[in-house]
Swiss-Prot record:
Pfam families: EFP, EFP_N, Elong-fact-P_C
Pathway membership: Protein biosynthesis; polypeptide chain elongation
Chain segments annotated as transmembrane: none
Identification of the protein by name: Elongation factor P
């Protein structure tokens, strides 16, 4: 059990026998009336995001979540195979466990997988990854000062928008949460 004072992003709550992960929360103390906590909760099974308000100080049941560092090995077509870095035990994860971030998975990437009662709930990639550009159109000399972007295909097959000065073969840092270009990595 936890109170609203214990809320933090990533905490998994058990509400109506469903596991809900806190994505965002805000403590509100209005000038009139009692304080409350406004939250955005994500159902860990369906991925549906809902808004819920809790009165301040209310006790809420939390789920015991075991987070483990695992290495992504390969995709066998229907699932992603990962290996526990401590026990070398392999597990097959359904595609929804990674969500949209799966498009940035590269072999031997360390991911953090969260389990509840032995069942995988969700997996998180590092916030940023260094990935090589497989293909992008060349930027024209006059285009470089405009600050525009162009599409580029990464070594994982994902497509992102990069600045015009990026060329095929460059290594770039990509934010895995939203797929945005962060910077060019010097080789």
């Amino acid at each position: 059990m936890a109170t609203t004072a214990d809320f933090k992003n990533g905490l998994v709550l058990k509400i109506d026998n469903k596991l809900q992960q806190i994505i965002e929360f805000q403590h509100v103390k209005p000038g009139k009336g009692p304080a409350f906590v406004r939250t955005k909760l994500k159902d860990v099974v369906s991925g549906k995001v809902t808004d819920k308000t809790f009165n301040a100080g209310v006790k809420v049941e939390t789920a015991t979540v075991d987070r483990r560092d695992m290495t992504y090995l390969y995709n066998d077509g229907s699932s992603y195979v990962v290996m526990d870095e401590k026990t070398f035990e392999q597990a097959e994860l359904a595609p929804h466990i990674f969500g949209d971030a799966a498009r940035f998975l590269l072999e031997n990437t360390t991911v953090q997988v969260s389990f509840h009662e032995g069942e995988p709930l969700f997996a998180e990639l590092p916030i940023s990854l260094d990935l090589r550009i497989e293909h992008t159109d060349p930027g024209l000399q006059g285009d470089r000062s405009t600050g525009g972007t162009k599409p580029a295909t990464l070594e994982t097959g994902a497509e992102i928008q990069v600045p015009l000065f990026i060329e095929t073969g460059n290594v770039v840092k990509v934010d895995t949460r939203d797929g945005s270009y962060l910077s060019r990595v010097n080789n």
